[in-house]
Protein backbone atom coordinates (compact mmCIF):
# COMPACT_ATOMS: atom_id res chain seq x y z
CA UNK A 1 0.00 0.00 0.00
CA UNK A 2 1.36 3.46 -0.95
CA UNK A 3 0.54 6.70 0.84
CA UNK A 4 -0.15 8.29 -2.58
CA UNK A 5 -3.42 6.36 -2.51
CA UNK A 6 -4.66 8.51 0.38
CA UNK A 7 -6.30 11.15 -1.76
CA UNK A 8 -9.57 11.05 0.17
CA UNK A 9 -9.58 10.49 3.93
CA UNK A 10 -12.71 10.04 6.02
CA UNK A 11 -12.81 11.33 9.59
CA UNK A 12 -15.09 9.49 11.99
CA UNK A 13 -15.53 10.39 15.64
CA UNK A 14 -17.24 8.89 18.64
CA UNK A 15 -20.85 9.98 18.34
CA UNK A 16 -22.19 12.59 20.79
CA UNK A 17 -18.77 13.05 22.38
CA UNK A 18 -17.90 16.78 22.60
CA UNK A 19 -14.26 15.96 23.34
CA UNK A 20 -13.63 14.89 19.73
CA UNK A 21 -14.80 18.14 18.11
CA UNK A 22 -11.59 20.18 18.53
CA UNK A 23 -9.13 17.40 17.57
CA UNK A 24 -11.34 16.32 14.66
CA UNK A 25 -11.56 19.81 13.15
CA UNK A 26 -7.85 20.33 13.77
CA UNK A 27 -7.12 17.09 11.96
CA UNK A 28 -9.43 18.03 9.08
CA UNK A 29 -7.60 21.33 8.61
CA UNK A 30 -4.21 19.60 8.84
CA UNK A 31 -5.16 17.11 6.10
CA UNK A 32 -6.71 19.76 3.88
CA UNK A 33 -3.53 21.84 4.08
CA UNK A 34 -1.69 18.80 2.71
CA UNK A 35 -3.94 18.70 -0.36
CA UNK A 36 -6.01 15.74 0.86
CA UNK A 37 -9.78 15.65 0.35
CA UNK A 38 -11.52 15.27 3.71
CA UNK A 39 -15.01 13.82 4.19
CA UNK A 40 -16.96 13.40 7.42
CA UNK A 41 -19.17 10.57 8.62
CA UNK A 42 -22.79 11.76 8.72
CA UNK A 43 -23.38 10.81 12.37
CA UNK A 44 -20.16 12.54 13.39
CA UNK A 45 -20.99 15.68 11.41
CA UNK A 46 -24.42 15.94 13.05
CA UNK A 47 -22.79 17.05 16.30
CA UNK A 48 -20.24 19.59 15.02
CA UNK A 49 -20.45 22.89 13.15
CA UNK A 50 -19.39 22.09 9.60
CA UNK A 51 -19.98 23.90 6.34
CA UNK A 52 -16.68 23.01 4.69
CA UNK A 53 -16.38 19.23 4.36
CA UNK A 54 -18.62 16.79 2.45
CA UNK A 55 -20.79 14.55 4.61
CA UNK A 56 -21.13 10.87 3.69
CA UNK A 57 -22.75 7.75 5.09
CA UNK A 58 -20.49 4.89 6.12
CA UNK A 59 -21.42 3.02 2.95
CA UNK A 60 -20.46 6.04 0.85
CA UNK A 61 -17.22 6.35 2.81
CA UNK A 62 -16.49 2.71 2.07
CA UNK A 63 -16.90 3.34 -1.66
CA UNK A 64 -15.06 6.66 -1.88
CA UNK A 65 -12.41 6.94 0.85
CA UNK A 66 -8.86 5.62 0.62
CA UNK A 67 -8.39 5.74 4.40
CA UNK A 68 -10.56 6.24 7.47
CA UNK A 69 -9.22 7.87 10.63
CA UNK A 70 -11.28 7.08 13.71
CA UNK A 71 -11.24 9.32 16.80
CA UNK A 72 -12.63 7.52 19.82
CA UNK A 73 -12.09 4.41 21.87
CA UNK A 74 -12.03 0.72 21.06
CA UNK A 75 -15.84 0.56 20.93
CA UNK A 76 -15.98 3.19 18.21
CA UNK A 77 -13.21 1.44 16.31
CA UNK A 78 -15.04 -1.90 16.50
CA UNK A 79 -18.27 -0.42 15.14
CA UNK A 80 -16.58 1.39 12.26
CA UNK A 81 -14.40 -1.60 11.38
CA UNK A 82 -17.42 -3.90 11.05
CA UNK A 83 -19.23 -1.36 8.87
CA UNK A 84 -16.28 -0.83 6.52
CA UNK A 85 -14.97 -4.40 6.26
CA UNK A 86 -16.80 -5.10 2.95
CA UNK A 87 -14.90 -2.20 1.35
CA UNK A 88 -11.34 -3.00 2.57
CA UNK A 89 -10.78 0.60 3.71
CA UNK A 90 -7.70 0.76 5.98
CA UNK A 91 -8.14 2.32 9.42
CA UNK A 92 -6.03 4.48 11.72
CA UNK A 93 -7.20 4.93 15.30
CA UNK A 94 -6.67 8.02 17.47
CA UNK A 95 -7.41 7.25 21.09
CA UNK A 96 -10.08 9.38 22.75
CA UNK A 97 -11.27 6.60 25.03
CA UNK A 98 -9.80 4.66 27.94
CA UNK A 99 -7.58 1.66 27.20
CA UNK A 100 -7.23 2.02 23.45
CA UNK A 101 -5.98 -1.41 22.35
CA UNK A 102 -6.98 -0.57 18.76
CA UNK A 103 -6.40 3.19 18.73
CA UNK A 104 -2.68 3.67 19.17
CA UNK A 105 -2.24 7.33 18.17
CA UNK A 106 -2.88 10.18 20.61
CA UNK A 107 -4.50 13.52 19.88
CA UNK A 108 -1.46 15.33 21.30
CA UNK A 109 0.98 13.80 18.80
CA UNK A 110 -1.32 12.88 15.90
CA UNK A 111 0.02 15.53 13.47
CA UNK A 112 3.63 14.52 14.00
CA UNK A 113 2.83 10.81 13.70
CA UNK A 114 0.61 11.28 10.66
CA UNK A 115 3.37 13.22 8.90
CA UNK A 116 5.35 10.00 8.77
CA UNK A 117 2.39 7.71 8.08
CA UNK A 118 1.08 9.78 5.18
CA UNK A 119 4.60 9.72 3.76
CA UNK A 120 4.39 5.94 3.62
CA UNK A 121 6.07 5.13 6.93
CA UNK A 122 3.58 2.71 8.47
CA UNK A 123 3.01 -0.99 9.00
CA UNK A 124 -0.10 -2.83 7.87
CA UNK A 125 -1.79 -5.30 10.19
CA UNK A 126 -4.65 -7.53 9.04
CA UNK A 127 -7.06 -8.52 11.81
CA UNK A 128 -9.46 -11.43 11.50
CA UNK A 129 -13.20 -11.37 12.15
CA UNK A 130 -15.77 -14.03 12.92
CA UNK A 131 -19.08 -14.76 11.25
CA UNK A 132 -21.87 -16.09 13.44
CA UNK A 133 -25.14 -17.63 12.30
CA UNK A 134 -28.01 -18.97 14.39
CA UNK A 135 -30.34 -21.57 12.91
CA UNK A 136 -33.72 -22.57 14.32
CA UNK A 137 -35.52 -25.60 12.95
CA UNK A 138 -33.11 -25.57 10.03
CA UNK A 139 -33.70 -21.92 9.10
CA UNK A 140 -31.29 -19.02 9.57
CA UNK A 141 -32.64 -16.51 12.10
CA UNK A 142 -29.57 -14.38 12.94
CA UNK A 143 -26.35 -13.45 11.13
CA UNK A 144 -23.65 -11.03 12.22
CA UNK A 145 -19.94 -10.21 12.18
CA UNK A 146 -17.72 -10.04 15.26
CA UNK A 147 -14.36 -8.29 15.47
CA UNK A 148 -13.79 -9.00 19.17
CA UNK A 149 -15.96 -11.89 20.23
CA UNK A 150 -19.18 -13.85 20.19
CA UNK A 151 -20.68 -14.29 23.66
CA UNK A 152 -23.44 -16.65 24.74
CA UNK A 153 -24.70 -15.55 28.17
CA UNK A 154 -27.49 -16.34 30.59
CA UNK A 155 -28.58 -12.70 30.75
CA UNK A 156 -30.41 -11.75 33.95
CA UNK A 157 -31.45 -15.32 34.72
CA UNK A 158 -30.02 -16.77 37.93
CA UNK A 159 -29.65 -20.26 36.50
CA UNK A 160 -26.84 -21.69 34.43
CA UNK A 161 -27.12 -22.41 30.74
CA UNK A 162 -26.33 -25.74 29.09
CA UNK A 163 -24.40 -25.87 25.84
CA UNK A 164 -22.91 -28.62 23.69
CA UNK A 165 -19.78 -27.66 21.75
CA UNK A 166 -18.62 -29.28 18.51
CA UNK A 167 -15.55 -28.34 16.46
CA UNK A 168 -15.31 -29.41 12.81
CA UNK A 169 -18.17 -31.80 13.39
CA UNK A 170 -16.54 -33.51 16.38
CA UNK A 171 -18.10 -33.41 19.84
CA UNK A 172 -15.76 -31.60 22.26
CA UNK A 173 -17.64 -31.07 25.54
CA UNK A 174 -20.88 -30.16 27.25
CA UNK A 175 -20.84 -27.02 29.35
CA UNK A 176 -22.91 -25.80 32.29
CA UNK A 177 -21.92 -22.23 33.04
CA UNK A 178 -22.94 -18.58 32.97
CA UNK A 179 -21.86 -18.46 29.35
CA UNK A 180 -19.20 -19.00 26.71
CA UNK A 181 -16.93 -16.54 24.88
CA UNK A 182 -15.51 -17.25 21.44
CA UNK A 183 -12.83 -14.61 20.83
CA UNK A 184 -10.51 -13.56 18.04
CA UNK A 185 -6.93 -12.54 18.87
CA UNK A 186 -8.22 -8.96 18.95
CA UNK A 187 -10.93 -9.94 21.43
CA UNK A 188 -8.54 -11.95 23.58
CA UNK A 189 -7.69 -8.75 25.50
CA UNK A 190 -11.37 -7.91 26.11
CA UNK A 191 -14.09 -9.93 27.92
CA UNK A 192 -12.19 -13.17 27.33
CA UNK A 193 -9.17 -11.85 29.24
CA UNK A 194 -11.25 -10.89 32.28
CA UNK A 195 -12.75 -14.40 32.22
CA UNK A 196 -9.35 -16.06 32.45
CA UNK A 197 -8.59 -16.55 28.77
CA UNK A 198 -5.13 -16.30 27.16
CA UNK A 199 -3.80 -13.31 25.25
CA UNK A 200 -3.38 -14.14 21.55
CA UNK A 201 -1.02 -12.12 19.37
CA UNK A 202 -3.10 -10.45 16.61
CA UNK A 203 -0.86 -11.98 13.94
CA UNK A 204 -2.04 -15.49 14.85
CA UNK A 205 -4.85 -17.22 12.98
CA UNK A 206 -6.48 -18.60 16.09
CA UNK A 207 -9.66 -18.48 18.15
CA UNK A 208 -10.13 -19.10 21.85
CA UNK A 209 -13.15 -20.56 23.63
CA UNK A 210 -13.45 -19.26 27.19
CA UNK A 211 -16.16 -20.53 29.58
CA UNK A 212 -17.72 -17.95 31.91
CA UNK A 213 -17.94 -19.24 35.49
CA UNK A 214 -18.17 -22.95 34.53
CA UNK A 215 -19.77 -25.34 37.01
CA UNK A 216 -16.95 -27.84 36.42
CA UNK A 217 -13.48 -26.45 37.01
CA UNK A 218 -12.02 -28.75 34.35
CA UNK A 219 -13.82 -26.69 31.68
CA UNK A 220 -10.81 -24.56 30.80
CA UNK A 221 -10.18 -22.13 27.93
CA UNK A 222 -8.96 -23.78 24.75
CA UNK A 223 -7.25 -22.33 21.66
CA UNK A 224 -8.09 -23.63 18.19
CA UNK A 225 -7.16 -22.84 14.60
CA UNK A 226 -9.05 -20.06 12.87
CA UNK A 227 -10.07 -22.36 10.02
CA UNK A 228 -12.21 -24.45 12.36
CA UNK A 229 -16.00 -24.39 12.34
CA UNK A 230 -17.57 -24.19 15.78
CA UNK A 231 -21.10 -25.48 16.32
CA UNK A 232 -22.86 -24.85 19.62
CA UNK A 233 -26.11 -26.61 20.44
CA UNK A 234 -28.35 -24.91 22.98
CA UNK A 235 -29.89 -27.25 25.53
CA UNK A 236 -32.33 -26.53 28.35
CA UNK A 237 -32.20 -22.93 29.47
CA UNK A 238 -34.52 -20.36 31.00
CA UNK A 239 -32.88 -17.47 29.19
CA UNK A 240 -29.86 -17.12 26.93
CA UNK A 241 -28.68 -14.36 24.65
CA UNK A 242 -25.96 -14.21 22.01
CA UNK A 243 -23.94 -11.01 21.62
CA UNK A 244 -21.45 -9.92 18.97
CA UNK A 245 -18.92 -7.34 20.19
CA UNK A 246 -21.50 -6.26 22.81
CA UNK A 247 -23.20 -4.58 19.86
CA UNK A 248 -25.83 -6.85 18.32
CA UNK A 249 -27.75 -9.40 20.34
CA UNK A 250 -30.37 -12.08 19.82
CA UNK A 251 -32.51 -14.25 22.13
CA UNK A 252 -31.73 -17.95 21.75
CA UNK A 253 -34.16 -20.81 22.30
CA UNK A 254 -33.69 -24.44 23.24
CA UNK A 255 -32.42 -26.55 20.31
CA UNK A 256 -31.03 -23.52 18.44
CA UNK A 257 -27.69 -24.09 16.76
CA UNK A 258 -24.93 -21.48 16.61
CA UNK A 259 -22.27 -21.70 13.89
CA UNK A 260 -19.08 -19.64 14.19
CA UNK A 261 -16.19 -19.47 11.73
CA UNK A 262 -13.62 -17.07 10.38
CA UNK A 263 -14.83 -14.34 8.05
CA UNK A 264 -13.07 -14.38 4.64
CA UNK A 265 -12.51 -10.60 4.84
CA UNK A 266 -10.07 -8.94 7.24
CA UNK A 267 -9.77 -5.53 8.84
CA UNK A 268 -6.71 -3.56 7.78
CA UNK A 269 -5.16 -1.45 10.55
CA UNK A 270 -2.30 0.96 9.91
CA UNK A 271 0.24 1.56 12.68
CA UNK A 272 3.28 3.83 13.02
CA UNK A 273 6.54 2.05 12.18
CA UNK A 274 7.56 2.12 15.85
CA UNK A 275 4.36 0.34 16.94
CA UNK A 276 5.01 -2.55 19.34
CA UNK A 277 2.24 -4.90 20.43
CA UNK A 278 4.17 -5.96 23.52
CA UNK A 279 4.88 -2.39 24.58
CA UNK A 280 1.18 -1.66 24.14
CA UNK A 281 0.32 -4.59 26.43
CA UNK A 282 2.75 -3.34 29.06
CA UNK A 283 1.25 0.12 28.99
CA UNK A 284 -2.42 -0.86 28.85
CA UNK A 285 -2.26 -3.73 31.34
CA UNK A 286 0.21 -2.12 33.72
CA UNK A 287 2.82 -4.85 33.52
CA UNK A 288 6.04 -4.37 35.47
CA UNK A 289 9.13 -2.86 33.90
CA UNK A 290 12.56 -4.44 33.59
CA UNK A 291 13.93 -5.57 36.94
CA UNK A 292 16.94 -3.59 38.11
CA UNK A 293 19.86 -5.15 39.96
CA UNK A 294 20.68 -3.72 43.36
CA UNK A 295 23.97 -1.86 43.35
CA UNK A 296 25.96 -2.42 46.53
Swiss-Prot record:
Keywords, ordered alphabetically: ATP-binding, Cytoplasm, Kinase, NAD, NADP, Nucleotide-binding, Transferase
Main location: cytoplasm
Binding residue positions for NAD(+): 74-75, 148-149, 176, 178, 189-194
Gene3D superfamilies (alphabetical): Probable inorganic polyphosphate/atp-NAD kinase, domain 1 (3.40.50.10330), Probable inorganic polyphosphate/atp-NAD kinase, domain 2 (2.60.200.30)
One Pfam entry name: NAD_kinase
Single biological process term from Gene Ontology: NADP biosynthetic process
Signal peptide residue numbers: none
UniProt keyword annotation of NADP present: yes
Gene Ontology annotations for the cellular component aspect, listed alphabetically: cytoplasm
Cofactor: a divalent metal cation
EC number: 2.7.1.23
Gene Ontology MF annotations: ATP binding; metal ion binding; NAD binding; NAD+ kinase activity
Reaction equation(s) it catalyzes: NAD(+) + ATP = ADP + NADP(+) + H(+)
Annotated localization: Cytoplasm
Catalytic center residues: 74
Its job: Involved in the regulation of the intracellular balance of NAD and NADP, and is a key enzyme in the biosynthesis of NADP. Catalyzes specifically the phosphorylation on 2'-hydroxyl of the adenosine moiety of NAD to yield NADP.
Family stated for the protein in its record: Belongs to the NAD kinase family.
Classification via HAMAP family: NAD_kinase (MF_00361)
Cross-referenced NCBIfam families: PRK01231.1, PRK02155.1
Name of the protein in its database record: NAD kinase
Organism in which the protein naturally occurs: Nitrosomonas europaea (strain ATCC 19718 / CIP 103999 / KCTC 2705 / NBRC 14298)
Phylogenetic lineage: Bacteria, Pseudomonadati, Pseudomonadota, Betaproteobacteria, Nitrosomonadales
Gene: nadK
